[in-house]
Amino acid sequence: MKKLKNKFNNSYLMINMIKNKINISSDNEIIEKNVYSLVGIDLIGNRDFLGFYIDKNNDNRFFLNLFETLKSKGINKIYYFIANDDGKLKRALNISYPSTIIITNLTMNIASLWYHISYRSRNDLISKLKKLYVQDNYDNAYILECCLKEDFNDNALVLLLLDKYFSNIEDYYQYDVDVRNFLFNHNSFTDFYDKIKSVSKERMFNDENDLYKEFNDYIEAMEKNRLYDKKKWSNILNHCSKYFPNLLEEVANIL
């Protein structure tokens, strides 16, 4: 089995935090806990699995300890951090990586709606929600948003959740469409979320090592396969450099 790296890259253009619930065996009891899986994309476009982190004790310092662990393993800069909306996480991230921009995790927000819509409607909903973030301009996105709400006009709870989790779409239209496509590449991470969710229904875990053994083959395959070819990655870097003036210089220093 491949071992998790002791040292990671100095900088990551993006780190995506994927939240799942798993069953933990503790003192002859089965306890449901949150596990956070971190996947990073470095400055040359390679993916790194950065570890499983189980919040075993609902500790107020959990996220702060997590970011301290990342720092101890060599990660000094994160440009974008993709995560669910959590006040404790945001505060800890601001302490450890104050210049990092936190972006709503589309996978997590979509998952919040799954229990309230039919199975057949899910793929259609995923497609429409992704499109909200990657239109050429916000006017087009607003039209799509209105159409989406009309689709669920008879489901008051879904409408409330759409307002709760997708009310800040306009904020992201400060970014170019290529950057938004990169930040909201939902499909690149939803497979990992679904895989953990599926396996967790069938078995318990004792700790992070158990998780790593279970998903080792998947992680190895994920790290080997790039999401973007070199030309596409260069375009992403060029667009992101508009918001981070020193980004291209940092990339040049490691090539």
What are these regions (language model features)?
Residues 1-80, 188-189:
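RNase H-like nuclease fold core
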Residues 23-25, 88-92, 112-114:
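Switch/connector loops and helix/strand junctions flanking conserved nucleotide-binding motifs
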Residues 42, 46, 70-75, 91-106:
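A short alpha->loop->secondary-structure connector
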Residues 61, 87-91, 160:
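Alpha-helical elements of the RecA-like P-loop NTPase motor core of helicases
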Residues 84, 161-170, 232-242:
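A glycine-rich phosphate-binding loop feature that marks nucleotide/adenosyl-phosphate handling sites
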Residues 94-191, 202-205, 223-227:
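Extended amphipathic alpha-helical interaction segments
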Residues 196-255:
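Basic, amphipathic alpha-helical segments enriched in Lys/Arg and hydrophobic/aromatic residues
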